[in-house]
């Protein structure tokens, strides 16, 4: 009986330790790899040929490339047009592809539309959970603007693209000449706030993956959050969800 108890206790201890490691794990850096180069006025960057399921959503003339802002931290950038730079920052949980329909309607002979994807989303690098801070994302996006050697721009941002994009520009305040703010704010909260219960639950690495990647895939349900479900068909959900 004592032997059975000790074996059971050992199994329980191993299970508990394993569960604790899983539920608190931080994750690891995943760095994407491109092919070839893209040459801009600012220099030469690593090209990233888009897979067909993503490329089919874009019109002609797009450039797709990485800007390595820190060792292993690559930001995927979509760019189209020539002229005055317009920096367009998406929010969570989408990517630079969010602005593809707006870009289609803008005069690309007069505007250079620059659409970076935040680290952790789309084709950009994936980082440990602990590195997802507003300060880090501000610095990384500012690194993109710096390496592109922009001297002035108009900014457009929505959702978390507001605090991140405006925060990035706060690090280089001379860049901004105008702003178009959508559903967003100027900065991150300056005081502690309580997360909603759903946000608090999915913040946990294991539970978040189980819920949002297994039981209730977030991108599969995005159409229900839109005013017009037809604007978010299965191939668009795939566009945002597959790289993540």
Where are these regions (language model features)?
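Sequence-pattern detector for short linear motifs
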Residues: 5-6, 28, 103-104
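N-terminal Sec-pathway targeting helices
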Residues: 1-13
